[in-house]
Structures are given as structure tokens and as C-alpha cells.
């Protein structure tokens, strides 16, 4: 299965780039798995929640997401180099 890597805009206006997997869940439970999410800040990518945890996978509720989009090719390339 190919990785689905997207730019994610959260309701707090934080922009992430991450592999994302939709998970079947009960109403109110987290239903998206973010794998190796990174915060996009101008031209810098920083692992999400870097100062708080060593985890690289996070569960999030889709109601915390405003929109999901395909990353520009240069951003995708930068992200892939960073995580590999």
C-alpha cells in the first residue's frame, strides 16, 4: 500500500505534513493516524510535538482538521528526505 502524504491544516491553524491513515472508530474517538507529522513553518520542517514526546505516530480526531491537501512537489521531497 502506498503512503498517503498530505498537508493538514488543523483548527488551531497549525500546518502539518504527514503520512495519514484513516481509521474506523466510534463516534467521538480519534479516527486519523498521523505518521511522522512535521510542522511546516516557512521553509522549516520540525517534528510535531518534538519537545513533548518521542512518539512518531499520533491519533487525532478528524473534527480537529479544517482541510487536507496534496503537498507541492518540493515540500514533499523535503519531507521525504527528512523522515528517511
Label for each model-derived stretch:
Residues 1-84:
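Conserved RNA-binding domains used in RNP assembly and mRNA/RNA metabolism
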Amino acid at each position: 500500500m502506498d503512503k498517503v502524504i498530505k498537508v493538514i491544516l488543523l483548527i488551531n491553524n497549525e500546518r502539518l505534513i504527514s503520512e495519514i491513515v484513516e481509521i474506523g472508530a466510534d463516534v467521538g474517538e480519534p479516527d486519523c493516524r498521523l505518521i511522522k507529522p512535521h510542522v511546516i513553518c516557512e521553509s522549516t520542517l520540525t517534528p510535531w510535538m518534538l519537545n513533548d514526546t518521542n512518539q512518531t505516530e499520533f491519533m487525532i480526531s478528524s473534527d480537529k482538521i479544517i482541510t487536507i491537501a496534496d503537498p507541492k512537489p518540493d515540500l514533499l521531497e523535503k519531507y521525504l528526505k527528512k523522515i528517511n
